[in-house]
Amino acid sequence: DEVRISIAHTCTDYDTAKAAFAAGASHMTHLYNAMPGITHREPGPIIAALEDGAEVELITDNVHIHPAMVRFTFNTFGADRVILIADSMMACGLPDGQYSLGGQAVTVRGPRATLTEQPGTIAGSATCLFDCMKRAVLDMGVPLESAVRAATLNPARSIGIDADYGSLDAGRYGNVVLVDDKLDILKVVRHGEVIG
């Protein structure tokens, strides 16, 4: 069984991140979140990931990352290295209100989930992956083809299931979300069967 190593929620510096990638890390979880930013004197783990070919995850819920940084990431890392994720907590799809995450009280308003005791601290997301993909296209200016790839093929490849999932190539499972021109869902097909 293959193990994939990811750098996540880290205070590491550039050199330490480079050493981690040289030792086999190949992925960066929740890019930009809870990690040092990029500066000209301290490039940090983000530049190490860029240089070493790492796959990077983006939470495109209109809360975690500014749209300009999302576009920057697609443009610099390339659409084949970006993986869209939702980082959803249990409140995803539920009404605004009070929820719990790991024993901590969380307040949800729209896509924003914050610690109730620390309202400025993000506590996951209340947005599903499809809506993150939709937001990336409609609100952040990511090309549709790039956003779909980042939500389907790239994550499947990252965990080694792209022989069966992630695209509509021959021999793969027929999983499809049919949308209209506003990216609203019309139908969902799972393993070739319409389920919604």
Predicted regions and their residues:
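His/Asp/Glu-enriched, well-ordered alpha-helical/loop segment
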Residues: 45-58, 62, 74-172, 176-178
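Short, Lys/Arg- and Gly-enriched loop/turn segments at beta-strand edges
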Residues: 182-189
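Active-site core of metal-dependent hydrolases
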Residues: 1-96
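C-terminal intrinsically disordered extensions
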Residues: 10-13, 99, 103-106, 183
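Mg2+-dependent phosphoryl-transfer enzymes with acidic/Ser/Thr/Gly-rich catalytic loops
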Residues: 196
